[in-house]
Amino acid sequence: MKKMTLFTLSLLATAVQVGAQEYVPIVEKPIYITSSKIKCVLHTSGDFNATRDWCNAGASIDVRVNVAQMRSVQSATSDGFTPDAKIVRFTVDADKPGTGIHLVNELQQDHSWFQSWANRRTYIGPFASSYDLWVKPVSGYTPKKARDLPQNENKNYQHRDTYGYSIGINGKVGAEVNKDGPKVGGEVSGSFTYNYSKTLVFDTKDYRINNRSSLSDFDISFEREFGECDELRRQELGCYFTAAHWGSGWVFDKTKFNPISYSNFKPNYDVLYEAPVSETGVTDFEMGVKLNYRARFGTVLPSALFSVYGSAGSSTNSSTVKQRIRIDWNHPLFEAEAHVTLQSLSNNDLCLDVYGENGDKTVAGGSVNGWSCHGSWNQVWGLDKEERYRSRVASDRCLTVNADKTLTVEQCGANLAQKWYWEGDKLISRYVDGNNTRYLLNIVGGRNVQVTPENEANQARWKPTLQQVKL
């Protein structure tokens, strides 16, 4: 049994040499769920006969969702095994959550009608009754939801935690982008564990966390736990209180509305999906934010001995913002092998490049030659355990030697013409033609690359260079 190495890092604080970039095949893309100049249209009073914009078109939603795509290979750790799976992770974290959700700078508290201190109508608002957020697959393949956070919590939940997810990465510990990629058996078949961590911070004040997720849908709500009776300045036997006729106080206690309910709220969440390595379809995910807001109305009514303060209902409305992202499970970033370019050391600027055929770089039989190094997917390869260099132009294309010693990409198989091994900086084909000759990858002139008998190969120095994966 081969030995595996446990290697744990944090993306928040990674100690590397200045200028060095750790090789971690994870692609991150921010998706912004954003809307500005939102109006908050609510009734003006408990008479419910007119409306106005309580936010003066100044409300906004700005939530930054970090979407990370990665491939994990199975590897052993002290905590168990990492999965062999294609993974996508949606995170709103403490590091870059966006500017948050905003209603107004200050709560409005005033009278909608006033006859006397003993007989009047009041209001307070607008404030958020709940903040709803979700991630869900809406079309295409439905992946399995492996984990979601946070869980159900009561109000005043204060917590800061770093949540990690371990993936197995093909290669060796400490590998760096633009440095040498795998060449020999132990490097090719080996893997290390990377702990992909994000920090979530919660300070929910008056809001409880209600996780309503099911199956592959992630659905969470931060719900205001105070009801209308709780928001009164005080309570007596029921949902009311009394005061002297000359009392000038408000029905509702403004101090019970924390700024998180109207000024700014920054949600955090983390949800992770897995797909089998055989999956090649697409999934359209919807990410959304719904801001539910409210204004509360109160009455002060005179009685024989005192005035009665009580709730007189509320007006509610909402604003919803959605975004979509398509995940292509057949994208080359989900391939298992370390991503490298095959760069010539006999030429200042030449990499092995899939030219394709008639403009189609993915077709079987597409030609392979040299080209200036640019690092696009048609120059990226992965050396698998069967000694094959798999092109990233498509999921089943391997570097192949033809009878005329030219190179193409063909459907991957067990043919010796698709097997390669390294001796120093020489990349040698296992292709045989009965002449007992070793054939080396070689520049035969200009940008033309073929395999050449060893004794004729004078531009045959190469290196596999690790590449940072990208969309």
Curated annotation (Swiss-Prot):
Alphabetized Gene3D superfamilies for the sequence: 2.80.10.50, Leukocidin/porin MspA
Matches recorded under SUPFAM superfamilies: Leukocidin-like, Ricin B-like lectins
Signal peptide interval: 1-20
Molecular function in Gene Ontology: carbohydrate binding; toxin activity
Keywords: Cytolysis, Hemolysis, Lectin, Signal, Toxin, Virulence
Gene Ontology biological process: cytolysis in another organism
Residues forming coiled coils: none
Any one annotated GO CC term: extracellular region
Domain of life: Bacteria
Signal in keyword set: yes
Listed InterPro entries: Leukocidin/Hemolysin_toxin, Leukocidin/porin_MspA_sf, Ricin_B-like_lectins, Ricin_B_lectin
Pfam family, one: Ricin_B_lectin
The keyword Transcription belongs to this UniProt entry's keyword annotation: no
Domain Ricin B-type lectin: 338-465
Family of the protein in this entry: Belongs to the HlyA hemolysin family.
The protein's role, per its UniProt record: Bacterial hemolysins are exotoxins that attack blood cell membranes and cause cell rupture by mechanisms not clearly defined.
Name of protein: Cytolysin
Naturally occurring in which organism (per UniProt): Vibrio vulnificus (strain CMCP6)
